[in-house]
Every structure is written in structure tokens, then in C-alpha cells.
Curated annotation (Swiss-Prot):
GO CC field: cytoplasm; mitochondrion; myosin complex
Cross-referenced PROSITE patterns: EF_HAND_1 (PS00018), EF_HAND_2 (PS50222)
More info: This chain binds calcium.
Official protein name in the record: Myosin regulatory light chain 2B, cardiac muscle isoform
Upper classification of the organism: Eukaryota, Metazoa, Chordata, Craniata, Vertebrata
Native source organism of the sequence: Gallus gallus
Length: 165
């Protein structure tokens, strides 16, 4: 009788499921299910194209889709999908580090910075942001009616992936 073999580990060694809380894993599973348009258990170029189309972006180039798929070490099943997000998030600075960086521009400790000022800083200092990156940030985190950016909430979302209740 041959001994039973354990399931092969995904590249990277450690258990990717231990990197996330159960609620986060469920959210990733929902995202994976939405992206797996043909419901075959894998995300491929066709799934990505259909996902972009569903989001209103119809002019995605083949090369862009190929580059996205090439980021994975092989076929993208849910475990690989989760591992890829884990690797991307592993390099994310802790919330306190990001907050401290914003606090440099907020000496009075108000918790917000003028959006125009932060835009200027991000586009002119080392590690410059592009106009497109600035637009994406302000689309996701629009300034308030006074033109201020709530950087405390922004930091929370960057590090936790969701807004505070």
C-alpha cells in the first residue's frame, strides 16, 4: 500500500492562508469568483478581458493581459491568486510608518492635508507619482469640500484594505 502524499505546497513555502484573516480570505474568494468569468477554477487572459469589460474598460491590450497573467508562476487558481496578493501586500509599510510620513506635512496634527499640497509633493519629490497615479488616488479618496485629503483614513485603507466603520 503506497503512502498517501500530502498536497504539494505552493511556491513560497509558508501557508498563504495564515497570512490573512478569515474575512479577508472570503473577500479574496469573492473577488476570485467574480474574475473567474468562465467558472473553471482558474483566471486566464479571457477571464481578465471579460472582467475589464464588465468594469467598462473595453480597450485592454493583449500585451497588458499577457503581462498580468505572466506575474503568476503558473495557472492562476485561488491559492496562487491569494499567494500573489500576499506577496504584493508583504512589502506594504505598517500603518504607523505611512501615518508618520503624512504627519510630516501636517505639523498641527489635524489629520488632513490640502490636496493640492500633497499632489505637489507627490509629483515633485523623490519617487515621483505620475499624474495618472494622482488621479487614481483622488478618485479613490476624493478631497472634502474644503480641498483636504483625510490621510488617516487613506492610511487605514492602504494597510487594511477597507474603510473604518
Amino acid at each position: 500500500m503506497a503512502p498517501k502524499k500530502a498536497k504539494k505546497k505552493v511556491e513560497g513555502g509558508s501557508n498563504v492562508f495564515s497570512m490573512f484573516e478569515q474575512t479577508q480570505i472570503q473577500e479574496f474568494k469573492e473577488a476570485f469568483t467574480i474574475m473567474d468569468q468562465n467558472r473553471d477554477g482558474f483566471i486566464d487572459k479571457a477571464d481578465l478581458r471579460d472582467t475589464f469589460a464588465a468594469l467598462g474598460r473595453l480597450n485592454v491590450k493583449n500585451e497588458e493581459l499577457e503581462d498580468m497573467v505572466k506575474e503568476a508562476p503558473g495557472p492562476i487558481n485561488f491559492t496562487v491568486f491569494l499567494t500573489m496578493f500576499g506577496e504584493k501586500l508583504k512589502g506594504t509599510d505598517p500603518e504607523e510608518t505611512i501615518l508618520n510620513a503624512f504627519k510630516i506635512f501636517d505639523p498641527e496634527g489635524k489629520g488632513h492635508i490640502k490636496a493640492d499640497y500633497i499632489k505637489e509633493m507627490l509629483m515633485t519629490q523623490e519617487g515621483r507619482f505620475s499624474q495618472e497615479e494622482i488621479n487614481q488616488m483622488f478618485a479613490a479618496f476624493p478631497p472634502d469640500v474644503s480641498g483636504n485629503l483625510d490621510y488617516k483614513n487613506l492610511c487605514y485603507v492602504i494597510t487594511h484594505g477597507e474603510e473604518k466603520d
